[in-house]
UniProtKB/Swiss-Prot annotation:
GO terms for cellular component: cytosol. Mg(2+) binds at residues 13, 15, 214. This is Mannosyl-3-phosphoglycerate phosphatase. The gene is yedP. Gene3D superfamilies: HAD superfamily/HAD-like, Putative mannosyl-3-phosphoglycerate phosphatase, domain 2.
Amino acid sequence: MLSIHDPLLIFTDLDGTLLNSHTFEWQPAAPWLTRLHESGVPVILCSSKTAAEMLQLQTTLNLQGLPLIAENGAVIQLDVHWEDHPNYPRLIAGISHNEIRLVLHKLREKEQFKFTTFDDVDDQVISEWTGLNRAQSALTRLHEASVSLIWRDSDERMAQFVARLNDLGLQFVHGARFWHVLDASAGKDQAANWLIEAYRQQWRARPLTLGLGDGPNDAPLLDVMDYAVVVKGLNREGVHLRNDDPQRVYRSQNEGPDGWREGMDYFFSRS
């Protein structure tokens, strides 16, 4: 159904998809990453992580120079060859990290919502939360257009909190382990569509798209893909897509990078 020689873009989530959620291992996906790189197929990382974290991961995965989608779509790192773009090197959706911090501070002071943001703690605490080393934990704090937090209040209070955020033009997104507050105009799907259009103009043909993700917050991204791999994950809610046609969507039996490889094998062995 898909060919490595098609005009093709691969969009992939990180934690629980390309990376093992616990060990951060990615090696099972290495043969496919090498093959895609050698064929000139862009692999676009898409995550709640900061751009600083993801740029480091790009180097590890030999994907440096390609675009990436950070902070759940609030930040797009542009391709290194797009220097002439007016927003190079990064496109930011909506208000900044510091503006969101101020909103959250006021909400917490006024309405006593209980949560702990990454800005409230030091690198050591984040290291304990994430399992990352201190240097990597420091990169997780470099948000540009969102705030990550741990929710410590009731479900009822969360509903009130979400309503307040929505009134202020913000959204509350549940990631693999943390919650994220970002501008309502941002999203993995909007960021992916922006990049698809950028490549369409560059290639003078609309690229085929394949997305891979494991969590409910990946559904908007997978919904705008031509083909999708739902990698088996830990989230009990599962991933519900608008179009779950088995011709378009494959659900893996394996988790993490093993499931990532399984999904790639499935779509590229059917042609």
